[in-house]
Protein backbone atom coordinates (compact mmCIF):
# COMPACT_ATOMS: atom_id res chain seq x y z
CA UNK A 1 0.00 0.00 0.00
CA UNK A 2 1.35 3.39 -0.90
CA UNK A 3 0.54 6.88 0.39
CA UNK A 4 2.20 10.04 -0.84
CA UNK A 5 3.39 12.67 1.66
CA UNK A 6 2.68 16.19 0.46
CA UNK A 7 4.36 19.30 1.91
CA UNK A 8 6.06 17.22 4.65
CA UNK A 9 2.64 16.62 6.20
CA UNK A 10 3.21 13.20 7.77
CA UNK A 11 0.10 13.34 9.97
CA UNK A 12 -2.18 13.68 6.96
CA UNK A 13 -0.37 10.82 5.20
CA UNK A 14 -0.78 8.59 8.27
CA UNK A 15 -4.50 9.35 8.40
CA UNK A 16 -4.82 8.47 4.71
CA UNK A 17 -2.89 5.22 5.25
CA UNK A 18 -5.07 4.25 8.22
CA UNK A 19 -8.21 4.93 6.18
CA UNK A 20 -6.93 2.77 3.31
CA UNK A 21 -5.99 -0.08 5.67
CA UNK A 22 -9.40 0.16 7.35
CA UNK A 23 -11.20 -0.03 3.99
CA UNK A 24 -9.15 -3.06 2.95
CA UNK A 25 -9.98 -4.82 6.23
CA UNK A 26 -6.35 -5.24 7.31
CA UNK A 27 -6.98 -4.33 10.96
CA UNK A 28 -9.93 -6.73 11.19
CA UNK A 29 -7.91 -9.53 9.61
CA UNK A 30 -4.99 -8.93 11.99
CA UNK A 31 -7.35 -9.13 14.96
CA UNK A 32 -8.81 -12.41 13.71
CA UNK A 33 -5.36 -13.91 13.05
CA UNK A 34 -4.03 -13.18 16.56
CA UNK A 35 -5.44 -16.46 17.89
CA UNK A 36 -6.45 -19.70 16.26
CA UNK A 37 -10.14 -19.90 15.49
CA UNK A 38 -11.71 -23.33 15.39
CA UNK A 39 -13.56 -24.10 12.16
CA UNK A 40 -16.85 -24.41 14.04
CA UNK A 41 -16.32 -20.99 15.65
CA UNK A 42 -15.43 -19.49 12.27
CA UNK A 43 -18.58 -20.93 10.72
CA UNK A 44 -20.74 -19.57 13.56
CA UNK A 45 -19.12 -16.12 13.32
CA UNK A 46 -19.57 -15.95 9.56
CA UNK A 47 -23.20 -17.03 9.87
CA UNK A 48 -23.85 -14.34 12.49
CA UNK A 49 -22.19 -11.73 10.27
CA UNK A 50 -24.36 -12.78 7.32
CA UNK A 51 -27.51 -12.47 9.45
CA UNK A 52 -26.37 -9.04 10.64
CA UNK A 53 -25.77 -7.91 7.05
CA UNK A 54 -29.17 -9.20 5.91
CA UNK A 55 -30.96 -7.38 8.74
CA UNK A 56 -29.11 -4.17 7.97
CA UNK A 57 -30.02 -4.44 4.28
CA UNK A 58 -33.68 -5.13 5.12
CA UNK A 59 -33.74 -2.15 7.48
CA UNK A 60 -32.27 0.14 4.82
CA UNK A 61 -34.70 -1.16 2.19
CA UNK A 62 -37.69 -0.62 4.49
CA UNK A 63 -36.50 2.89 5.29
CA UNK A 64 -36.11 3.71 1.58
CA UNK A 65 -39.62 2.46 0.85
CA UNK A 66 -41.01 4.54 3.70
CA UNK A 67 -42.15 1.71 5.93
CA UNK A 68 -40.20 2.93 8.95
From Swiss-Prot:
InterPro entries noted in UniProt: Ribosomal_bS21, Ribosomal_bS21_CS, Ribosomal_bS21_sf
GO CC annotation: ribonucleoprotein complex; ribosome
GO molecular function, one term: structural constituent of ribosome
Superkingdom of origin: Bacteria
Keywords per UniProt: Ribonucleoprotein, Ribosomal protein
GO biological process terms, semicolon-separated: translation
Any Pfam family: Ribosomal_S21
Family, as annotated: Belongs to the bacterial ribosomal protein bS21 family.
Protein name: Small ribosomal subunit protein bS21
Source lineage: Bacteria, Pseudomonadati, Pseudomonadota, Alphaproteobacteria, Rhodobacterales
